[in-house]
């Protein structure tokens, strides 16, 4: 999420909480919880729901803390992230590492105890994908960092599904694919209006390496692909008319933003598109949940 220097140092607890990127963690956990409910025609057992939610949230927070640790010098050079306690030097490297280790350990134990080993190992693999492969290797090396690294960020629905069933079937991977394709246009609109930040930090984001026009075109192309991919839950029979209607309406507005960015770009427009992309994903997954339980009632 976009955050500016209006943040001020707070209590020690709030500083540690900031390391977990709470709003990003909340979205990831939300998608995981939707995956849990879609995995069963009835209700999710409360122990699995509670344990899966807490465990996935803890490991996500642990991964984000490692990200803050690795990127503290980069964050200090960027207006969007300079407020973070790691960038300000308010928390030491050892403290961040210890905090991340505790969160990760508790998260893994919670998942193993209240869900199943598959969920634990998949979530640990997601942690490695984000904290190590994306943060350490992909992000500083290639403008395709978001495309390739998006795989780890797309996993929450599969983690939730696995928590309930102990398996990851095709329908779960459709949900993963939706987030995977959503990730590039979501981050590229941010990179467009924060281009100077990334350029100053030496990060090879697409607008920095290939220019604004190239990035605008790829935002449009990926949004078109995203619109098509979001039809898959209906085509596969996983979802019905409630979801389809929502996906078409939400996707049409996302496409409108992408088209406007391509044809008549402004930083203000990119900011609105970035914020909408978060609302879009949240409402899309909410529509999946509503459809899942409404479909047997309305028969559509």
Swiss-Prot record:
Pfam families xref list? UbiA
| Gene3D superfamilies documented for this protein | UbiA prenyltransferase
Which GO cellular component terms, listed alphabetically, does the Swiss-Prot or TrEMBL entry include?
plasma membrane
GO terms, molecular function:
protoheme IX farnesyltransferase activity
GO terms in the biological process aspect are:
heme O biosynthetic process
Topology within the bilayer: Multi-pass membrane protein
The enzyme's E.C. designation: 2.5.1.141
* Residue ranges crossing the lipid bilayer per the database entry: 24-44, 48-68, 94-114, 118-138, 146-166, 172-192, 217-237, 239-259, 278-298
Q: Where in the cell is it found?
A: Cell inner membrane
**Keywords on this record?**
Cell inner membrane, Cell membrane, Heme biosynthesis, Membrane, Transferase, Transmembrane, Transmembrane helix
Q: Which domain of life is it from?
A: Bacteria
The EC category is transferase
Q: Does the keyword Transferase apply?
A: yes
Tell me if Transferase is a UniProt keyword of this record. yes
The pathway where this protein functions is: Porphyrin-containing compound metabolism; heme O biosynthesis; heme O from protoheme: step 1/1
Main localisation? membrane
Q: Which InterPro entries match?
A: Protohaem_IX_farnesylTrfase, UbiA_prenyltransferase, UbiA_prenylTrfase_CS, UbiA_sf
Which catalysed reactions does the entry list for this protein? heme b + (2E,6E)-farnesyl diphosphate + H2O = Fe(II)-heme o + diphosphate
Role played: Converts heme B (protoheme IX) to heme O by substitution of the vinyl group on carbon 2 of heme B porphyrin ring with a hydroxyethyl farnesyl side group.
Name the family the entry cites. Answer: Belongs to the UbiA prenyltransferase family. Protoheme IX farnesyltransferase subfamily.
UniProt miscellaneous comment: Carbon 2 of the heme B porphyrin ring is defined according to the Fischer nomenclature.
| PANTHER family assigned | 4-HYDROXYBENZOATE SOLANESYLTRANSFERASE, PROTOHEME IX FARNESYLTRANSFERASE, MITOCHONDRIAL
The protein's name is: Protoheme IX farnesyltransferase
């Amino acid at each position: 999420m976009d955050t500016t220097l209006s943040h001020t140092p707070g209590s020690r607890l709030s500083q540690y909480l900031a390391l977990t990127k709470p709003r990003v963690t909340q979205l990831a956990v939300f998608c995981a919880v939707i995956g849990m409910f879609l995995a069963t025609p009835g209700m999710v057992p409360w122990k699995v729901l509670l344990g899966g939610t807490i465990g996935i949230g803890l490991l996500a927070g642990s991964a984000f803390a490692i990200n803050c640790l690795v990127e503290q010098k980069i964050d200090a050079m960027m207006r969007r992230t300079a407020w973070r306690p790691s960038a300000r030097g308010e928390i030491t490297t050892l403290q961040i590492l210890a905090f991340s280790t505790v969160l990760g350990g508790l998260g893994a134990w919670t998942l193993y105890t209240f869900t199943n080993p598959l969920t634990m190992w998949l979530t640990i693999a997601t942690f490695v994908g984000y904290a190590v492969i994306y943060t350490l290797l992909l992000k500083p090396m290639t403008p395709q960092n978001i495309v390739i690294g998006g795989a780890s960020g797309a996993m929450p629905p599969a983690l939730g599904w696995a928590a309930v069933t102990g398996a990851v079937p095709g329908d779960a991977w459709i949900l993963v694919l939706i987030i995977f394709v959503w990730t590039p246009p979501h981050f590229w609109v941010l990179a467009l209006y924060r281009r100077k930040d990334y350029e100053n930090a030496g990060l090879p984001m697409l607008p920095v390496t290939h220019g604004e026009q190239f990035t605008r075109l790829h935002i449009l192309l990926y949004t078109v692909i995203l619109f098509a991919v979001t039809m898959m839950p209906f085509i596969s029979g996983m979802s019905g008319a409630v979801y389809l209607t929502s996906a078409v309406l939400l996707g049409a507005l996302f496409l409108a933003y992408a088209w406007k960015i391509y044809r008549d770009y402004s930083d203000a427009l990119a900011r609105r598109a970035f914020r909408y992309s978060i609302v879009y994903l949240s409402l899309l997954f909410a529509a999946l949940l509503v459809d899942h339980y409404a479909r047997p009632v309305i028969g559509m």
